[in-house]
């Protein structure tokens, strides 16, 4: 049965892709995901797999390919959360030569996105950081923190991003240490990077005191 065969192929490839993704092996995961998508047919999960392809391409700097997959997600008219994240992906993978702040602003004004303002401001900050506009990036990250509400991962991610900028760009160790401390206080202890960030904050604070 060809249909069953295609379903089995898709499941095999997508399961392998998931395992590689868990190991942070983005290239391997992407190859398997793209192959798996050829066999998936009209599955309700197709939009989600397109979205993951978009994310992986964006993380590897393949913005043109990322945009293709984000558009595929939006074409399928998914539920709100998936559409929101695909729209953000489209904007964050936009060419740095283009001014995306107007489009981000439209997303901020959309009442449907009221609970996701922290995420939007974080994407705006990431875009400014890619342009090396670090002061603007810090400003948007602070807006992200102020608007994150109970979304601890977003809030912690923005604290960490500010800390990284102060440490790596401005070499302001005291400010970096303060923001790493805020990251640790905010970040859920079951997050995979909690121990690594705790050690980084501890080492930096010891360096400042020495």
Model-derived regions, located:
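Alpha-helical solenoid repeat scaffolds, predominantly canonical TPR units
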Residues: 32, 69, 103, 140-141, ...
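Eukaryotic tandem repeat interaction scaffolds
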Residues: 80-148
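Residue-level signature for tetratricopeptide repeat
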Residues: 19, 56, 93, 127, ...
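TPR/TPR-like (Sel1-like) alpha-helical repeat modules
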Residues: 64-82, 91, 172-209
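Solenoid-like repeat scaffolds
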Residues: 1-7, 34-44, 71-80, 94, ...
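"A position-specific structural signal for the A-helix of alpha-solenoid helical repeats
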Residues: 8-18, 45, 51-52, 84, ...
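Structural motif corresponding to the intra-repeat A-B loop/turn of tetratricopeptide repeats
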Residues: 23, 60, 97, 131, ...
């Amino acid at each position: 049965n060809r249909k069953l065969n295609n379903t089995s192929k898709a499941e095999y490839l997508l399961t392998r892709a998931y395992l590689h993704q868990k190991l942070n092996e983005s290239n391997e995961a992407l190859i398997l995901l793209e192959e798996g998508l050829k066999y998936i047919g009209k599955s309700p999960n197709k939009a989600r797999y397109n979205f993951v392809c978009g994310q992986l391409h964006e993380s590897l700097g393949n913005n043109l390919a990322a945009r293709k997959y984000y558009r595929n997600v939006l074409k399928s008219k998914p539920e709100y959360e998936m559409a929101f994240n695909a729209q953000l992906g489209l904007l964050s993978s936009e060419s740095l030569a283009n001014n995306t702040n107007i489009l981000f602003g439209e997303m901020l004004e959309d009442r449907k996105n009221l609970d996701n303002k922290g995420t939007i401001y974080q994407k705006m900050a990431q875009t400014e950081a890619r342009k090396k506009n670090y002061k603007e990036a810090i400003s948007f990250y602070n807006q992200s923190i102020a608007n994150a509400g109970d979304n601890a991962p977003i809030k912690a991610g923005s604290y960490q991003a500010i800390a990284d900028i102060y440490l790596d760009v401005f070499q302001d160790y005291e400010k970096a240490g303060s923001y790493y401390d805020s990251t640790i206080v905010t970040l859920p202890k079951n997050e995979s990077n909690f121990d690594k960030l705790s050690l980084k904050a501890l080492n930096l604070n010891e360096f400042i005191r020495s």
